[in-house]
Amino acid sequence: MFDLNLKDKVILITGGSDGLGFASAKLLSEQGAKVALCGRRGDYLKEKANIIREETKNDVLDIQCDVTDADQCKNLVEQTISHFKTIDVLVNNAGTSAAAGFENVTDQNWEDDINLKLMAAVRLCRLVLPIMKEKKSGSIINAAIGGGKAPNAGSLPTSVTRAAGINLTKSLSNEFAPFNIRVNAICIGLIKSAPVSYTHLTLPTTLSV
């Protein structure tokens, strides 16, 4: 396997119990990284973390956390620091594939999506950037989608929220580059995962096909 030069790097991944988050955590642990995972379902998260521990024989920290809650975000970072002493990489991966036409998206849908995908990233970046600034190194990776740059019809509120995340990424990248901190977004395409599978299973019903 190719070497990503990640041995003993501490990587915090939100939305780490399923899909791309879990797959990334497993690969990074295989590369020797010390991984901290968070998810809302504590027992399920622990099961998935145990899979990674057993397969990689590496230290994996699982922390139950709802990233839409500011206090829980603070606790997530504090527990990671307490266990691993630092954070080298933050992966803001939490999110859903919410997609509907404009007339079907309620105020609550907008608020929930922005809180989950954008404000969670804002809060966690705010918490980890001082740590990275102090040691003059670090990396933040924000999950996004191509629809954040070129949205399709019926892609709300996700496309708007991800567009904001892409803008946040570029803003932070410009601001914190002098501190040797890299901030990047990955525009993810269709990947076979639980959220995508659910979307495709329910799409015919949504479209009344």
Enumerate the language-model features and the residues they cover.
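Substrate-binding pocket helix/loop in short-chain dehydrogenase/reductase
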Residues: 101-102, 106-114, 196
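Active-site helix of classical SDR
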Residues: 125, 161, 169
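Alpha-helical segment proximal to the catalytic Tyr-Lys
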Residues: 130, 174-178
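Residue(s) in the substrate-gating loop at a strand-loop-helix junction
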Residues: 145
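Conserved small/polar residues in nucleotide/adenosyl-binding loops
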Residues: 199-205
